[in-house]
Amino acid sequence: ASLEVAPGVQLFDTPEFPEQWKATAGAARELLQILQGEKHFNWTYVSPSAFIEPGERTGKFRLGTDQLLINDRGESRISTQDFAVAVLDELESPTHQHVRFTVGY
């Protein structure tokens, strides 16, 4: 929910963001803010697409940083299988240290 949908506008702050998700998403956003100020230990924060759902492993996902990834149909999605692959890839070969990254199609 802390990914940007426009410059300076996070998904969390849009009218479309579901009210029932705000408590959990708000806590996650606060954690990211705390981590972004942390220099004493190595951390990585992973933000999924707007929708993370069961699906096949395709291996055809994109990585991003602070912007919500949108596919050519205007959707922000990732399967749990591909999300897991991206996280494991990061664990095996870290490339996002002291930053957040996101995964989507």
Model-derived regions: residue spans:
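Oxidoreductase cofactor-interface core, primarily capturing Rossmann-like NAD(P)-dependent enzymes
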Residues: 2-105
